[in-house]
From Swiss-Prot:
Compartments where located: Mitochondrion inner membrane
Chief location: mitochondrion
Keywords: Membrane, Mitochondrion, Mitochondrion inner membrane, Repeat
UniProt organism field: Kluyveromyces lactis (strain ATCC 8585 / CBS 2359 / DSM 70799 / NBRC 1267 / NRRL Y-1140 / WM37) (Yeast)
Membrane topology category: Peripheral membrane protein
Protein name, UniProt field: ATPase expression protein 3
Amino acid sequence: MDKLRLLGSYLRKSPLTSTVSEPGIKISPKQFTFSVRVRDKDRPSKISTTKINEPASKLENTSTVVHNEYLNSLQLPYLARTSLRVSKYDYKRAAQFSNTLKRTLKTQDAHERIFSISSEDVAKLISSLFQVSEDNVSLVAKKRFFERECFTEIPKITEEVLSDIQEFEDYIGLLTHTKFHHKGSSLQDGIIPKLLKNLLHPSNLRIAPLKTASVFNDVIYYYGNKNNFATCRELYAQMKSEGIAPNVQTYNLMLRNLLRNSRLIKQQLPYREAIFYLERMKKENISADVITWNTCYFLLKDNISRAIFLEKMVERGVPLTYHLLYGILEEEDIPFNVIIDFLRENDIPVDTKIIKICHRSLIKRDKFQASWKLMEYARHLNFRVKDPFFLEEYLRQFSEKGRMDMCIMTVNTFKATFEVEPTLHCYDLLFKCLVRQGYSSEFSRVYQMLLINLKEHTGGHVVMNYWIAKCRAIMNSNIKTIPTHDSITRLDALAKRCIWDKRGIKWNCWLEYSEYRNVFRRLGSVPYQSNSRDQLDKHEVAKSSKKKVKYLKKLKETAIRNKQSHDAAYRNDYYSALKNDLINRGIIEEQAK
């Protein structure tokens, strides 16, 4: 809350500024040509989990060799991963520094102590920002919008994509911003990262004229979200070596990656690396925008530095934006009443983003009734509450407690009242809830019901995750009879009748919504049997045991073995295997060989 008070003191000098955004362009998979799936007859089936045919390190070595070949083709010897390290990364020293920093932040004089060791770097950081800022620091409008997830094959690489720079930029933007679940395309070892590296390969002469700063920015964004910061730095170096000038978005992404990386175990504070990027901006005559200033603010670790930074922002005329406020509210776990008081004191109007932050604050404190009233209030005032965010927040809390009854009622109510359909993450949470609830005679029927609804959402695909695998393991160990299709259909029809009404969200829905007790029984949501009302309030959650560690290890080993079987061709000839994969999936034409 210290950061919030600090911001409030400067809002009197410089009120919050809104980013005036022009209507952005939505880029959807539907804009591109979809492939016709070709069945690969030679595709190996999943192998048994009882044997390990080859060591897992073999596939990792193949990936390393391919990546080294990529780096060597850049001819940039200063890149860290172009040669073997003389000495290994001192993880022990990094852990010691990070632990010391955490302990220091908990002391009474934390801010004074941290400022004393970093004041020079903070001063240089602010000075560097001044040098790359114009008189009027620009606001940034969002120009492109992408769909959150897609369950079809990735779009086909057509001649239109390969002959037009704008089409190519949109195509790369789609691959890097939309999560494609089909065959795990967007995963770390999926087809998308392989395709991106092949397209951006220095020896790919056909793509060379299509490479722009926007293309590299999108790929840096993609790897930054996967915490692959080394690849981001290599892409930045590749841009410069190929004569593609970075822009302010490039440096904002590198600073954003630095911010994400600083939250991991590190050997030093992130200020010097930030100064390096700012000095590069000065050398290349690139002006900082509001995002640059905001990102640098969140790099700071102590309130003294933050106060100086905000003072200099106001002095330089940098607008204090809502994005800065959102970041502070999300970074600290601030109670709902404190947020409301802050907004009232500083005369800040409420928008949808602030509604979301307040909603999350209430949910974290189990104030479900208040959070529901907040949503009703926002809906009547025409705020955009038709957002899966709110549904996911409820399900995240209910699933942790194993409350399948509350999860199902919440999903149904969001469909009926807010016209919000559950996302893939919502289904992940529902399967988690089923596991947390524990085994009952209805376990298999509820699982099959959720699976049918999931397939309706994904178009027939089952996107595997830990909780689905856990459900299957529980059924293999316990299930005696297989539920019929009719019984599953009846359960689904009954479950969809359960919704929250004017009574609101009640933790004791067994008592408050007694008309649904028969459905709750069928869902396996029978409360702890006791005469004590206090005991009834406490739901017994199925606790994980030591077996969980062994189970996760077995899942990992199974995945590695199946991957080895599928990627055998990549170990023999990586690029030929990649071409065959793209052709078999219809992403490129066969004559493109």
